[in-house]
Design a protein with these regions (language model features):
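Catalytic Walker B motif of ABC-type/P-loop ATPase nucleotide-binding domains
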Residues: 133-137, 142
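The feature captures the beta-strand-to-loop junction immediately N-terminal to the Walker
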Residues: 7-9
Length: 170
């Protein structure tokens, strides 16, 4: 697996490129391929089984608990209306532990700091268990300790990582 860094100044299109890769935007020209298949011809669920995203900004219109947010990462592996099972909860608990947020599982997402929210979103991506991980400025809201933790974690993952990042020292 490899780590691909997208580097550039503010406004250079890093996030726009990533949004094309993770289907928020459709390219004006050309196409994005994933495993040899044009991304926009795949179902959203199929592409979500292959890549997880940690976006720069994450908003929820409802106040979910941390555990509920991370459980959303399991959705691509489920049939319609299939309930979460013991294996899902085990995966979620492990993901929360990996990002040092296990003690926050029952807190609501909106009560967390920006850095804590970013770590929960990373846990959601880990719970998704995909071969590729897209990171859009993943260290934006993190203090230096958690920036280093995140980058060390990313290095250990056996997945392809595409990341836009500002700080080349991390």
């Amino acid at each position: 697996k490899e780590l691909v860094g997208i580097i550039g100044p503010n406004g250079s299109g890093k996030s726009t490129l990533l949004k094309c890769i993770y289907r928020i935007l459709k390219p004006d020209a050309g196409a994005v391929y994933l495993d040899g298949e044009e991304l926009h011809s795949m179902s959203v669920k199929s592409s979500a089984r292959k890549m997880a995203v940690v976006a720069q900004h994450n908003y929820y219109n409802f106040d979910f608990t941390v555990r509920e947010v991370v459980l959303m990462g399991r959705a691509p592996h489920k049939k319609t209306l299939e309930r979460d099972n013991a294996k899902d909860y085990q995966i979620v608990d492990e993901a929360l532990k990996t990002v040092q947020m296990e003690t926050f599982a029952d807190r609501t997402f909106s009560t967390l700091s920006g850095g804590e929210q970013q770590r929960v979103i990373l846990a959601r991506a880990l719970a998704q268990q995909t071969p590729a991980l897209i990171l859009d400025e993943p260290t934006n809201h993190l203090d230096i300790t958690h920036q280093i933790m995140l980058m060390e974690l990313v290095k250990k993952l056996n997945v392809t990582v595409i990341s836009a990042i500002h700080d080349l020292n991390i």
